[in-house]
Amino acid sequence: LSRRQRQMCIRDRGGTTGASNAGREPYCEYYASQVAETMGLNAVHYDLENWKGITASKCELFTNIDTAYIPIGRIVRTGGIAACLAWYEKLGTEFSEQLCSMLVFDALIYNEDRHFGNFGVLRDNHSGKIIAPAPVFDNGLSLFCYAGKEDYAHLDEYAKTRSNPYNISYEEVCAEVMGARQKEQLRRMIGFRFKRHESLNLPEEHLQAIEK
């Protein structure tokens, strides 16, 4: 492998298999990445590829020999998302703002899988110091990933059946963390449309339903 290839994506993920609506996670990862980028978040960029006949999402690593990812669940062990917010606030405004932005983003895309291993911080492997919030990553279980054709016309009702890992509604999370930065990030979504992949896409009716 070339040096560039070694630096490039070493994180390929396929989707689930089985039911007619299975296997959609890589697609939703790709589309959710577009939302994060439009909002201007510190987020991992995802693309799609066909790998040995399997549709997979791919991205570049955000860690290296000098930098480690530490999941928040290894640091804040009790108290849920409220305790995580308080811990981030102690690290400073930028840490706190990025966490709040991630939570608003998750609510916007109905991310159902932002558990305490799916966000965290970056640590300098030499000094042991926390140096930055980790970028937003792993957003595949979102955008009504498992919605069926019968749900597309009634997404408002379907949305009520979706939940995050915190036992708090998406609306309650947003009410707690929404600030000026997050409002500006949401304004950037006005008129947003998903960029279709040249060959790998969710059904068009799914995309049109979630674009409304």
Could you describe each region identified by the protein language model?
Residues A83-G148:
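Conserved kinase catalytic-core segment
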Residues R11-T17, E60:
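Active-site ExK catalytic segment of metal-dependent nucleases
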Residues Q5, I54, K129-A132:
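Conserved catalytic motifs of the protein kinase core domain
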Residues A19-H45:
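A conserved alpha-helical element in kinase catalytic cores
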Residues D47-L91:
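Conserved structural core of kinase catalytic domains
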Residues T16-A19, N118:
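A short, flexible beta-alpha/helix-coil linker loop
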Residues H126-K212:
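C-terminal catalytic region of ATP-dependent kinase domains
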Residues L1-I10, D47:
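Single conserved hydrophobic/aromatic residue that forms the stacking wall/gate
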